[in-house]
Swiss-Prot record:
Its main location: other. The gene is Exoc1. The keyword Transport applies. Residues 460-491 have a biased composition (Low complexity). Keywords: Cell membrane, Coiled coil, Cytoplasm, Exocytosis, Membrane, Phosphoprotein, Protein transport, Transport. GO terms for cellular component: cytoplasm; exocyst; Flemming body; perinuclear region of cytoplasm; plasma membrane. This is Exocyst complex component 1. The keyword Protein transport applies. Residues 438-459 have a biased composition (Basic and acidic residues).
């Protein structure tokens, strides 16, 4: 095994700079294959790499080859299988488990022991040894001894050093010079000893010969040391001299440092003083303006504004650390605070006086607007107050409590002022709308009957308001009283819903203009006030309130909440919300007054809701385009809901009145009242809603109304006793069709076609029903002829039937001479004239249809005679031309 180890070292490991430490002859467990060797090696160069190498003998058996190598650090477990009994098997756990069988247990133990020592030395006990004897691993040996053992092993490994080529060559030369070296080793050793003695003697003589030179060298060294001592003495003297100079230089340096430090401190102190003087010194002119400056003139306001800005800058200056500890700074800050408080009180007091004065000045102008439908102009007041806008901004940032108090006072004064102005404005609008004067208000104190008489008396003297009639009285109308369907109302104070038919176009146009004038006056008033509030109270620049707001009192003295007109408290989260809340409080009377005006307009004429819906929708749309969340947009939107509700109520009332309408049992029906009402409504609506934004609402109303008209026309026609059902249906649907054709309402195209179809169907039905059988006996005769033909008798053979021969035919024809026919047609014309109404003018249409139907029957009889009685020469005693002449003369005679 030693020879194999030396061979492997020489052939495989030495070329790779490796040393072989241990070797074991193994084969794989369970397989009968050639043996191989597992070798434990280390590299000769650092860092040391430890490997386990598998070496296999070549197939020819003359040399070894390296098959595979594993780094020892990759070895996880060494399993000896049995720690007590001798067992040549062992496992090495690399990336997978390798099972080996050693040629002997001793070789296995020696190899495992080597692996253990390498693990102790290079891997810091990383490998786990399983089923290995404790004696083998030297666990009983202390750590120090273990290290010595490991070191000894390394030394044992180092005992063997292979000769290099030069050493081998020298040994060979020496041995060639001594032939006896091999035959007589003792002689060779003795020779070597003698040569060694000769060499030692030569070395001693050489040393003794160099003694003189050594003495000379020692003498030179002594002289050099003496020179060095002298130089050191001179250097010491120089050092003492330099030490005094160093002390003087240190003193000068320290003095310069102190001078520089003093200068630096002086510069910094001057800078701090200049900073405080420049930033915390308020000019005397500013102080005077704050204490007693004029707050009336523009120049005085400008001076106060500049002084307030300068004061704010001085108070808001960012002091450097330590400044607030200075007594002068504290005194100056206290002086600034006193100036701020004093000026804030002066400013708040002055502005409160301005608000009060404005209320008195505006009140004096109310009389001028009491007879005109205009609102007083607040622009001069806004213009004067806007001069204080910058001061209000200053007050807001410095003393929010006084700022909020001014806001509350402004809202209180202005809300009362606007309430008076707006109520007077709406009173004028109501008077112009109803055509009354202020004196009519005193009628409210009169008894109901006396008030009604007074109102009727005024209407007889030319009052422009025609407040008569009630749409709720349709159920009391008769066809005969269609010219005067409505009863007069008792008074303005007790008005019901007015009928649109009693108000002419001029009255409705007047209402439209008044309502538009009201909205046109309110809109700029609200926008101007909102713009003024935004600019004067500086609420448009920041979205969030300052932190100080939460500490200030609100407009009502509590937390920062605003109360809507509905009574609920709303938190103000932004300045935009605050503007809206201020507008709500200032103009809290606008929405109720608008609703009252709308209610009055609806009472005067329910059709006024059409005008109001269009106008209000347009103004809401305009306001929302400017600011959807503004007070004006919200208020008009709420009022629009009321207007839309009134519009829907108007439609519902019309449908209800259709259902409640009653007709006279003694007179002909004619055009039903609600059909005429629908025509009036549609014509008015089309003129109002032309290019309007709410066209969709009108289309929905059209659909509801037309369905109600169709249903109730049929209902009335079924209940009619005096007028035939077909006449009622024909006349009313003809009127509806004519109305829809004239107005060209796109959403009612299907209903227009339906009305035309119903008119046509009932016209045909009425013609057939009224015409009946004018030639009754002749008609019965030919019905019998047609019955025989239907039974299978040929037409030309019918004349051979006893009851239908030529003689019977001539007998029947003689009973209807032209004179009798004309008399029958004349009676029919009178009957139709009695059924039809003059309003629709359908008499000639119906008469022409009857003429066509009579001619059709005549032609039918002529055809039967020609087919069933060919060559008989039998003909009617009157011709088609006679029929045309009869009908024409009858129509002209009436």
């Amino acid at each position: 095994m030693t020879a194999i180890k030396h061979a492997l070292q020489r052939d495989i490991f030495t070329p790779n700079d490796e040393r072989l430490l241990s070797i074991v002859n193994v084969c794989k467990a369970g397989k009968k294959k050639k043996n191989c060797f597992l070798c434990a090696t280390v590299t000769t160069e650092r860092p040391v790499q430890v490997k386990v190498v598998k070496v296999k003998k070549s197939d020819k058996g003359d040399f070894y080859k390296r098959q595979i190598a594993w780094a020892l650090r990759d070895l996880a477990v060494v399993d000896a299988k049995d720690a007590i009994k001798e067992n040549p098997e062992f496992d090495l756990h690399f990336e997978k488990v390798y099972k080996w069988v050693a040629s002997s247990t001793a070789e296995k133990n020696a190899f495992i022991s080597c692996i253990w020592k390498l693990n102790q030395r290079y891997l810091r006990k990383k490998i786990d040894f399983v089923n290995v004897s404790s004696q083998l691993l030297e666990e009983s040996v202390p750590s120090g001894e273990n290290q010595s053992v490991a070191g000894g092993d390394e030394e044992a490994v180092d005992e063997y050093q292979e000769l290099n080529a030069r050493e081998e060559q020298d040994i060979e030369i020496m041995m060639e010079g001594c032939e006896c070296a091999i035959s007589n080793a003792e002689a060779f050793a003795e020779k070597l000893s003698r040569e060694l003695q000769v060499l030692d003697g030569a070395n001693i003589q050489s040393i003794m010969a160099s003694e003189k030179q050594v003495n000379t060298l020692m003498q030179l060294l002594d002289e050099a040391l003496t020179e060095v001592d002298q130089i050191e003495l001179k250097l010491s003297s120089y050092e003492e001299m330099l030490q005094s100079v160093k002390e003087q230089m240190d003193q000068i340096s320290e003095s310069n440092h102190l001078i520089h430090l003093s200068n630096t401190n002086n510069v910094k102190l001057l800078s701090e003083i200049e900073f405080l003087v420049n930033h915390m010194d308020l000019a005397k002119g500013h102080i005077k303006a704050l204490q007693e400056g004029d707050l009336v003139s523009s120049r005085g306001i400008e001076a106060c504004t500049n002084a307030a800005d300068a004061l704010l800058q001085c108070m808001n200056v960012a002091l450097r650390p330590g400044h607030d500890m200075l007594l002068a700074v504290k005194q100056q800050q206290q002086r600034f605070s006193d100036l701020r408080e004093h000026f804030a009180r002066r400013l708040a007091s002055h502005l409160n006086n301005v608000f009060v004065q404005q209320g008195h000045d505006q009140s004096s102008t109310l009389a001028q607007h009491s007879v005109e439908l205009t609102l007083p102009n607040h622009h001069p007041f806004h213009r004067d107050l806007l001069r204080y806008a910058k001061l209000m901004e200053w007050l807001k940032s410095t003393d929010y409590g006084k700022y909020e108090g001014l806001t509350k006072n402004y809202m209180d004064y202005l809300s009362r002022l606007y309430e008076r102005e707006i109520k007077d404005f709406f009173e004028v609008a109501k008077m112009k709308m109803t055509g009354t004067s202020k004196e009519s208000k005193k009628f409210a104190t009169l008894p109901r009957k006396e008030s009604a008489v007074k109102q009727e008396t005024e209407s007889l003297h030319g009052s422009s308001g025609k407040l008569t009639g009630s749409t709720s009285s349709l159920n009391k109308l008769s066809v005969q009283s269609s010219g005067s369907r409505r009863s007069q109302s008792s008074s303005l104070l007790d008005m019901g819903n007015m009928s649109a038919s009693d108000l002419d176009v001029a009255d409705r146009t007047k209402f439209d203009k008044i309502f538009e004038q009201v909205l046109s006056e309110l809109e700029p008033l609200c926008l101007a006030e909102q713009d003024f509030i935004s600019k004067f109270f500086k609420l448009q620049q920041h979205q969030n309130m300052s932190a100080s707001m939460t500490e200030a009192e609100d407009l009502d003295g509590g937390s920062l909440l605003r109360q809507h007109s509905s009574g609920t408290l709303l938190p103000v989260s932004s300045e935009k919300d605050m503007i809206r809340q201020m507008m709500i409080k200032i103009f809290r009377c606008i929405e109720p007054e608008l609703n009252n005006l709308i209610a009055l307009g609806d009472k005067v004429d329910s059709f006024n809701s059409l005008y109001m819906l269009v106008k209000m929708s347009h103004h809401v749309w305009t306001a929302q385009n400017v600011d959807p969340a503004s007070f004006l947009s919200t208020t008009l939107g709420n009022v629009l809901v009321t207007v839309k509700r009134n519009f829907d109520k108007c439609i519902s009332n019309q449908i209800r009145q259709m259902e409640e309408v009653k007709i006279s049992k003694k007179s002909k029906v004619g055009i039903l009242p609600f059909v005429a009402e629908f025509e009036e409504f549609a014509g008015l609506a089309e003129s109002i809603f032309k290019n309007a934004e709410r066209r969709g609402d009108l289309d929905k109303a059209y659909t509801k109304l037309i369905r109600g008209v169709f249903i109730n026309v049929e209902k009335v026609a079924n209940e009619s006793q005096k007028t035939p059902r077909d006449v009622v249906m024909m006349e009313n649907f003809h009127h509806i069709f004519a109305t829809l054709s004239r107005l060209k309402i796109s959403c009612l195209e299907a209903e227009k076609k339906e009305a035309k179809q119903k008119y046509t169907d009932h016209l045909q039905s009425y013609v057939i029903y009224s015409l009946g059988q004018p030639l009754e006996k002749l008609n019965h005769f030919f019905e019998g002829v047609e019955a025989r033909v239907a039974q299978g008798i040929r037409e030309e053979e019918v004349s051979y039937q006893l009851a239908f021969n030529k003689q019977e035919l001539r007998k029947v024809i003689k009973e209807y001479p032209g004179k009798e026919v004309k008399k029958g047609l004349d009676n029919l014309y009178k009957k139709v004239d009695k059924h039809l109404c003059e309003e629709e003018n359908l008499l000639q249409v119906v008469w022409h249809s009857m003429q066509d139907e009579f001619i059709r029957q005549y032609k039918h009889f002529e055809g039967l005679i020609a087919r069933c009685y060919p060559g008989s020469g039998v003909t009617m005693e009157f011709t088609i031309q006679d029929i045309l002449d009869y009908c024409s003369s009858i129509a002209q005679s009436h």
